C-alpha cells in the first residue's frame, strides 16, 4: 500500500463468527470526486461518486443517478449474450441501484441541483456472499469522501434469521437455513446515542414454510422488529469505519449553490389568499372531486398572487405544494383525520373477484379504494423458466412476476413500453412476497408467470399486486401454502411525535415521511420495504408500525378468503404437466440417437417432454390422455414391465418381410405377426403376400400369443381387428 492509499476495517461480531468489511481509497478511480473500494471476503466493489460543475437551476428535483455495473469477470464468466459483453443492467443490478439510492437521496443537502452520479462496479465476487450490501457501503464511502454536502456515512448490512438467531452478512449456506432475509441501512444520529433506520428491504426465504414445519421460529412482527435492533451494531461499526477513512482521506467540504424552492413571503401570501379554500378542498373524500377542486384552487392562487411575485412563478408552484403538505399533515396530527376522512388506522373499501378474464389460466381483480389491480396467471412447462445472466447464484426463475403501471392508471398521458426501474422494483417486491408460499417444483411442476396490471392508482399498487396475485394464483389452481396480503403504512413526524397511517393514499405518500410496505400470511411476514424522507426513523417506531400493519393485513385476508378460500380446479386451457422418474442410466435410451426416440414419443402423443439430469422427466400436454400416453411410452423404455401372453396392444407396422410383419408394441419392443396369422384379415383365405393386407405405418390391434425363452414375441390379430377387416370387406 503506497502513501496515497488509506484503509479502514469494520469488524462485525456474529454468532457464526466475525465478518470483516474493509474500505480502501486512493488507489483506484482517482479523478472521481470520491472513490472507495469495499471488500467482504473476496467480494470487491468499486464505487465512484462524481458531480457536475454547474447546477441545473431549471430542475425542481435533486438529479441523483445511481448505476450498478455487474462485470461477469467478477465470477470468472463470459457474458451469455450474442456479443459476449455486458449490455443493459440485469434485474439484480437495477434492484441494487434502488437499494443504494433510497438511503443516499435523503442524505444530501436539500435544494442541491448539481447532477451527482454514483457508479458501483462489481470487480470480484466471492461465491459465498451477495454483493448488494457491499455496494451500498462502497457508495456511502465514496460519497462521504467526495466533499459533497452529504450527511453520511451510511451503513448497510444484511441480517438473516438462522436457527433463531440474527446473523449479520450471512453466507449463501446460512441463508439456505434462514427463515427471514433482511437488508437494513441506517446512520448514527448526531449525538451518537442510537442508529436511525433509513431503508429496509426484507423477505421470508423460499424455504421458510418447510423450516417452520421442522420447528424453526416464524418471522413474526416481533421477530422482525428484533432483527432491526440486531442490525444496529453492524451499522454503527460500518459507519465508524467509514468515518475513520474520511478522517484520513476525505476531500475538503465544497460549497455548492442550494436553490430554495420558495421564500416565506410567497408562502405567507398564498396562505392568506387561498388558505381556507385549500383546506376545504383537502377535506373532499373522493379523489376525482378533490383533484378537480384542487385544480380550481391552484388556478385561483396563481391569479391572486401572480402580480405580487412577477417572475417568481416557479416559487408560487412550490409554495402551493408546501402549503398543501402543511395542511394535510396538520389535520392528521391535530385531528387524527386524513384527506379522505378516515382515521389513522382505517382501511379503504375492499373488493376482490376471481375468474375475471375468459380463457386465461387464472385471473383476479382486487380493489382498495381507487387502487385497482388486475392479476393474471399463466402456467407453462418448466422449460419456459426464465434464464438469468447475472452474478448471483440463481441461474433460472420458475416464478416470474411482472408489474405494469400504465399512465392511464392515474388519469394521465405518458410513455408506454419497456418497464422502468420503478416497475421492476414493484414487481420484484410482489414476487418476493409470494415466493415463500409457492409450491415446490416437485409439488407443482409448472413455470408460473404472474402479471400485475395497475389499472387504477391511489396508493400502494405494489401491495395491491400482492393481493391480486394471491387471488389469481389460487384461481389458476396453484396450491399456495398460505394466502398472502399486503398493506402500505405511512408516517407523519411532528416535533418529537410520530403518527402512523394505515393504507396510505398517493397524496399521503407524497406529503408524508415514510412509505412502509408489509406483506405476509396470517402467521408471519413474507416481505417488507421501507423508504423514508427523514434522516432516519427509530426502530421502536417501525416495530409499532409493523403491529399496526398486521391488523390491516388480517382484515384484507378475510375479504380475500370470501372471494376464494382454496385453489380452484385448473383451467381447461392450462397445460397438464405430469412427471415420471427413470434411472439416470436410462436417460440416453429415452432420448435415443440424435433425439430420435424422444421426438417420436412427442410426435405420437402430442406432448412436450423435458428431461432433467437427475432422471426426472416432466411431460406437458393440452390434455390428460396425451400426457399419460407419453408417460406410458417412457415407462416402456426406462421402467419396462415384461408383456404377458394374452395382452393386447394397438401396435404400428414397422417392417414387412416375406414371412410376416414386425409390429411395434411400445418404444423399443416389437413382436412378429407371422404371415400364417393373417387369414383372419383376409376372410379366412391364405395370404401370399403380406403387402396385400398390411402396410408400413398401419395401426393394428394385436394380441400376444407366445413369448419364447429368448423373449421374442409372437402376435396374432385381435378379434376386434378381424371383425373390423371382415366388416370392411
From Swiss-Prot:
Entry's Gene Ontology molecular function annotations: 3'-5'-RNA exonuclease activity; magnesium ion binding; polyribonucleotide nucleotidyltransferase activity; RNA binding
Organism domain of life: Bacteria
Annotated keywords: Cytoplasm, Magnesium, Metal-binding, Nucleotidyltransferase, RNA-binding, Transferase
Pfam families: KH_1, PNPase, RNase_PH, S1
Main enzyme class: transferase
Broad class of the protein's primary localization: cytoplasm
SMART domains per record: KH, S1
Domain KH: 575-634
Family annotation (InterPro entries): ExoRNase_PH_dom1, ExoRNase_PH_dom2_sf, GPSI/PNP, KH_dom, KH_dom_type_1, KH_dom_type_1_sf, NA-bd_OB-fold, PNPase
Catalytic activity: RNA(n+1) + phosphate = RNA(n) + a ribonucleoside 5'-diphosphate
Location within or outside the cell: Cytoplasm
Gene Ontology CC annotations of this record: cytosol
Cofactor(s) needed by this chain: Mg(2+)
Recorded family membership: Belongs to the polyribonucleotide nucleotidyltransferase family.
Descriptive protein name: Polyribonucleotide nucleotidyltransferase
Encoding gene per record: pnp
Amino acid at each position: 500500500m503506497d502513501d496515497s492509499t488509506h484503509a479502514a476495517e469494520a469488524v462485525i461480531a456474529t454468532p457464526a463468527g466475525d465478518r470483516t468489511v474493509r474500505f480502501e481509497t486512493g488507489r483506484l478511480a482517482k479523478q472521481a470526486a470520491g472513490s472507495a473500494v469495499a471488500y467482504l471476503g473476496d467480494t470487491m466493489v468499486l464505487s465512484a461518486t462524481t458531480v457536475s460543475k454547474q447546477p441545473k437551476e431549471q430542475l425542481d428535483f435533486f438529479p441523483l443517478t445511481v448505476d450498478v455495473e455487474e462485470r461477469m469477470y467478477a465470477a470468472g464468466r463470459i457474458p451469455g449474450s450474442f456479443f459476449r459483453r455486458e449490455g443493459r443492467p440485469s434485474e439484480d443490478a437495477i434492484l441494487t441501484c434502488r437499494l443504494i439510492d433510497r438511503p443516499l437521496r435523503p442524505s444530501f443537502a436539500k435544494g442541491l441541483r448539481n447532477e451527482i452520479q454514483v457508479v458501483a462496479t462489481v470487480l470480484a465476487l466471492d461465491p459465498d456472499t451477495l454483493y448488494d450490501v457491499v455496494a451500498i457501503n462502497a457508495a456511502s464511502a465514496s460519497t462521504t469522501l467526495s466533499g459533497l454536502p452529504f450527511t453520511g456515512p451510511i451503513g448497510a448490512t444484511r441480517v438473516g434469521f438462522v436457527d433463531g438467531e440474527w446473523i449479520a452478512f450471512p453466507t449463501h449456506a446460512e441463508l439456505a437455513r434462514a427463515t427471514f432475509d433482511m437488508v437494513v441501512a441506517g446512520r448514527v444520529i448526531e449525538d451518537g446515542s442510537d442508529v436511525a433506520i433509513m431503508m429496509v428491504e426484507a423477505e421470508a426465504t423460499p424455504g421458510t414454510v418447510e423450516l417452520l414445519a421442522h420447528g424453526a421460529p416464524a418471522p413474526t412482527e416481533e421477530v422482525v422488529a428484533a432483527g432491526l435492533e440486531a442490525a444496529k451494531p453492524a451499522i454503527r461499526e460500518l459507519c465508524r469505519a467509514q468515518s475513520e477513512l474520511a478522517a484520513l482521506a476525505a476531500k475538503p467540504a465544497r460549497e455548492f449553490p442550494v436553490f430554495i424552492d420558495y421564500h416565506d413571503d410567497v408562502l405567507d401570501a398564498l396562505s392568506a389568499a387561498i388558505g381556507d379554500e385549500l383546506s376545504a378542498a383537502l377535506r373532499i373524500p373522493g379523489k376525482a372531486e378533490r383533484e378537480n377542486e384542487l385544480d380550481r384552487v391552484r388556478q385561483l392562487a396563481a391569479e391572486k398572487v401572480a402580480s405580487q411575485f412577477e417572475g417568481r412563478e416557479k416559487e408560487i408552484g412550490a409554495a402551493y405544494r408546501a402549503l398543501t403538505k402543511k395542511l394535510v399533515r396538520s389535520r392528521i396530527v391535530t385531528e387524527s383525520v386524513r384527506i379522505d376522512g378516515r382515521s389513522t388506522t382505517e382501511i379503504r373499501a375492499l373488493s376482490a373477484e376471481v375468474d375475471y378474464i375468459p380463457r386465461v389460466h387464472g385471473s383476479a381483480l382486487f380493489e382498495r379504494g381507487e387502487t385497482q389491480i388486475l392479476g393474471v396467471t399463466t402456467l407453462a412447462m418448466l422449460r419456459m423458466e426464465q434464464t438469468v445472466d447475472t452474478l448471483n447464484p440463481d441461474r433460472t426463475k420458475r416464478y416470474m412476476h411482472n408489474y405494469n403501471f400504465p399512465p392511464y392508471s392515474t388519469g394521465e398521458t405518458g410513455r408506454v413500453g419497456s418497464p422502468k426501474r420503478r416497475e421492476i422494483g414493484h414487481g420484484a417486491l410482489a414476487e418476493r412476497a409470494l415466493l415463500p408460499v409457492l409450491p415446490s417444483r416437485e409439488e407443482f411442476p409448472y413455470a408460473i408467470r404472474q402479471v400485475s396490471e395497475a389499472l387504477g392508482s391511489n396508493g400502494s399498487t405494489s401491495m395491491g399486486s400482492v393481493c391480486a396475485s394471491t387471488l389469481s394464483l389460487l384461481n389458476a389452481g396453484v396450491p399456495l401454502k398460505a394466502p398472502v396480503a399486503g398493506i402500505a403504512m405511512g408516517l407523519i413526524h411532528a416535533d418529537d411525535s410520530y403518527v402512523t397511517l394505515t393504507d396510505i393514499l398517493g397524496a399521503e405518500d407524497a406529503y408524508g415521511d415514510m412509505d412502509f410496505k408489509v406483506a405476509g400470511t396470517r402467521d408471519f411476514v413474507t416481505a417488507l420495504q421501507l423508504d423514508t424522507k427523514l434522516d432516519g426513523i427509530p426502530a421502536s417506531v417501525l416495530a409499532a408500525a409493523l403491529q399496526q400493519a398486521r391488523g390491516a393485513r388480517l382484515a384484507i385476508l378475510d375479504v380475500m378468503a370470501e372471494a376464494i378460500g382454496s385453489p380452484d380446479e385448473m383451467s381447461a386451457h392450462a397445460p397438464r404437466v405430469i412427471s415420471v422418474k427413470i434411472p439416470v442410466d436410462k436417460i440416453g435410451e429415452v432420448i435415443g440417437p440424435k433425439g430420435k426416440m424422444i421426438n417420436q414419443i412427442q410426435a405420437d402423443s402430442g406432448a412436450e417432454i423435458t428431461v432433467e439430469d437427475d432422471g426426472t422427466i416432466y411431460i406437458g400436454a393440452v390434455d390428460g390422455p396425451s400426457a399419460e400416453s407419453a408417460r406410458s411410452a417412457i415407462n416402456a423404455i426406462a421402467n419396462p414391465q415384461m408383456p404377458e401372453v394374452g395382452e393386447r396392444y394397438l401396435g404400428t407396422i414397422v417392417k414387412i418381410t416375406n414371412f410376416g410383419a414386425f409390429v411395434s408394441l411400445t418404444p423399443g419392443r416389437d413382436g412378429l405377426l407371422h404371415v400364417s396369422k393373417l387369414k383372419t384379415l383376409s376372410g379366412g383365405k391364405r395370404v401370399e403376400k403380406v403387402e396385400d393386407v398390411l402396410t408400413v405405418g398401419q395401426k393394428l390391434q394385436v394380441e400376444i400369443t407366445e413369448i419364447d425363452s429368448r423373449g421374442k414375441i409372437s402376435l396374432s390379430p385381435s378379434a376386434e381387428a378381424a371383425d373390423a377387416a371382415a366388416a370392411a370387406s
